[in-house]
Amino acid sequence: MKKTKYSISSWKKNELHPSIADNKAIDWIFMVDLLNFSFWSELDKEIQSNPSSERFSIEYNNNRYTGYWSLCAAINRALEDEIPITTPSFYMSEKKLTDNGIRHIFRSATKEEMPLLDERIHSIREAGKVLVEKFGGSFVNCITRANKSAANLLKIITENFNSFRDESNFQGRKVFFYKRAQILIADIWACFEGKELGEFHDIDKITIVPQALYHLGALSYSPSLLNLLESFTLIPHDSRPEIEIRDNDGDNGSSSNSSSSSGGINAIILDYFIWDFASQNKHKLSYGF
């Protein structure tokens, strides 16, 4: 990480991320992280190391993007077309923005449409309504209400926005996987470089990419689980294998952060580094997420 000069400023260096830290950037980040889930494609079964060229993708500025970056590209494309997709009062209203209008915004460059598009449309409507009715029409007001506390903001997010409330039951106990809520806070912190709206006195929440951790030797899978992953078998939501992967994922992130914090690297920067490593080395990563 030190060799590559990875730091809090690295987030804004990506051309698809907002370059200016302002209220518009907050609304952009909220929309992206609201929809940042499940880009799995059945087409990827055919090629184990690289995404299929026929899978869902977004064409933007003469480039094609998949996964998380396709989401960023679609939103930027809409904003350039003067569609205010990051404005809650706009996207909450079916009169101002129809479901077909949302489908147009996330139109694919291939025949495969965005995965779980109906679920994403539902999340957009629901979140927009909450922001307008409870928070003055902007996620900025959620941040100010948190009073510079990441823990407070996490609570506000998970108590008010169903899409971010990721919970499961494991052996009779409720477990909480607030991955995207944590990423939302982390992205705001990174965009503002820990200042102004991105200033949190307790910024210590984040998650890690398990596939990259496996490749780096920080996480091991049992032979039976590896067989499932190698065969591209869909692991059911809330199943024991899924919950154990996600739980160990978080534990590894915490352990890794403890060993690196003395060098000025916190859990968020570590997560961004590992996520970028996974993206840049996806052809080397043999097993699915």
Model-derived segments and their meaning:
Residues 1-178, 220, 224, 278-281, ...:
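Phosphate/adenylate-binding glycine loop and adjacent helical scaffold
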Residues 154, 158, 182-185, 210:
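Hydrophobic core segments within long, regular secondary-structure runs in both alpha-
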Residues 186-254, 259-289:
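Accessory, usually C-terminal, subdomains that scaffold auxiliary metal cofactors
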Residues 163-203:
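Glycine-rich phosphate/ribose-binding loops and adjacent secondary-structure elements
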